[in-house]
Amino acid sequence: MSLTGGSLHLSSVTSMMLGMLSQNRRARVIAVANQKGGVGKTTTTINLGAAMAESDKRVLIVDLDPQANATTGLGISSRGLQSSVYEVMLQQTTVTEVVCATEVPNLEVVPSSLALAGAEIELVTAFSREHRLDRALETVADDYDIILIDCPPALGLLTINALVAAGEVLVPIQCEYYALEGLGQLVGNVELVKENLNPGLEVSTIALVMYDARTNLSEQVAEEVRTFFGDKVCRQVIPRSVRLSEAPSFGQPITLFDPTCRGAIAYRQLAKEVLG
């Protein structure tokens, strides 16, 4: 059994020991993942993190997508960075050295940059390459209550690193046609990582996003998702909102950009559900 061209080379005992690192942490480490692009993954990561920070949780967002949308969406220019998560993955620096504060109290981010795209190739021959992020986050686990990892849409070494580092997976699903396309593959890949690298991993949360109450389609998709995933689906849905779409261009989460809009209220409620 293999992932990304046979990237599972560690012995089963070593893999299990390394995979158990995340279970001993104080922070909850949540990978926000969906193998489809354009499903509100980064929007959910940013705004869920900001809403959790408002609830006095110490939150770290790890931008593991080379597009760096979570970075810029939190008001940080990826072009002006001296180092980013790319250098962390190559073990050239630490999370502590690259972490950036945001406008939101209690919310920090490990920024990304376009250079991260090269990490997929550079890590191919690296020892214990699936555990680079896991080991890096272990050093700051006591500094945060929640660590959210914004995964790239493709299943490569970056996403595998996120799944190995995480204890749970949150999947945003847009309430639109083809919403479930590729979802079975994602669940299957999570199971592969669980069996081979991280026995504690589970899909814990499904968030319904881009919900349009004016259409029957949104409700039909929501019903289908709830039938498939049961109580893992959050009760709170995230509405389709122009304000949610505008906020990233201003480098702010919706809780700052428009604190009283429907999107901000919805993400605060979603945060309460996820926090439990």
Specify the residue positions occupied by each region the protein language model found:
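P-loop NTP-binding core
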Residues: M1-G276
